[in-house]
Regions:
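Structural scaffold elements adjacent to functional motifs in cytosolic proteins
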Residues: 46-49
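Rhodanese-like catalytic fold shared by cysteine-dependent sulfurtransferases
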Residues: 2-8, 13-38, 54-86, 92-128
Length: 128
């Protein structure tokens, strides 16, 4: 567990040092297993499901909040007041979560980790 935590810490530090990508946005991509390890070793994060409310209600990761990708625009997001807090982003298959991560980065959020879609999520899920 200590090695996994050290690996994640290194990953986070490296992501903070990387140059922005071609689109000018900066977020890290991690695996679902890395997201689980982060959730097990930290409490200072928020899980954001960027699917539609209907998809979210069918099945989502426990404690995730639903902010549909289509609603992330150019203004502040009330559910995410701390722009430095770790934001773990996912969708169904990974496409919308990448788009949302780029938009969040453009809004000034600095600690974003995108981990794909719930289709490949090995952990627990709940429904509304």
């Amino acid at each position: 567990m200590k090695k996994y935590f050290a690996f994640l810490l290194s990953l986070i530090l490296l992501a903070g040092c990387q140059a922005p990508g071609g689109s000018g946005n900066n977020y890290q991509q991690i695996t679902p297993d890395e997201a689980i390890a982060l959730m097990e070793t930290s409490s200072d994060y928020v899980i954001v499901d960027v699917r539609t409310p209907e998809e979210f209600n069918e099945k989502h990761i426990p404690n995730a909040i639903n902010i549909p990708n289509e609603t992330i625009q150019t203004s502040e997001i009330p559910q995410l007041p701390d722009k430095e807090q770790m934001i773990l982003v996912y969708c169904r298959s990974g496409n919308r979560s990448k788009q949302a991560s780029e938009k969040l980065s453009a809004l000034g959020y600095t600690n974003i980790a995108e981990f794909g879609g719930i289709n490949s999520w090995p952990g627990e899920t709940v429904s509304e």
